Amino acid sequence: GINFSNKSYNHMVYGLTVVEIINKISFDNNPCEIIFRLVKKTLEKMNVSDNYLIKIYYLFFQLQLLIYIGFQPSFFKCFKCKTKLNVGSFCIEIGHMVCLKCSTKKIISIEKKGLDYIRFLMTTHIDNIYQNIPDNKKCLNSINNVLNKFILYHISELKKCKLFTNELENELI
């Protein structure tokens, strides 16, 4: 079972945030087996991980959940001109990644290393995540920032999610 009693504050916050996200987006009396397995496995992994890895499992959870509920982010091509992204700028007006040429603000939201790690998290089984852990906190924070903006744009229910919105105010790492 899951036991956060002897763990850190981060274990509890991230675990409860996962549960609160599911609570806000789930429909009553409409269980989804695949999302249940995602939540269960994520919480189990968080329970036995150090603080750094917990946050990576949290990013994994968010990406996989978006895929399962039909909001798979397109982080690898510009939403406007469809060119492959080497760096991306999150366009808050349309809720998607764009290239710097199409960006109105010309601000890089995420570097290539971050895009590559998103691809890894989207295509890797949760049991294999430990094999590729970036040591770059800036990279993880940029992924977290872009994911949070994407989620809040596309899933408005999470604006009412206190833990999720509080987590936005702080850096991931």
For each predicted feature, which ranges?
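Non-catalytic alpha-helical scaffolds and adjoining flexible linkers that form interface surfaces
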Residues: 1-173
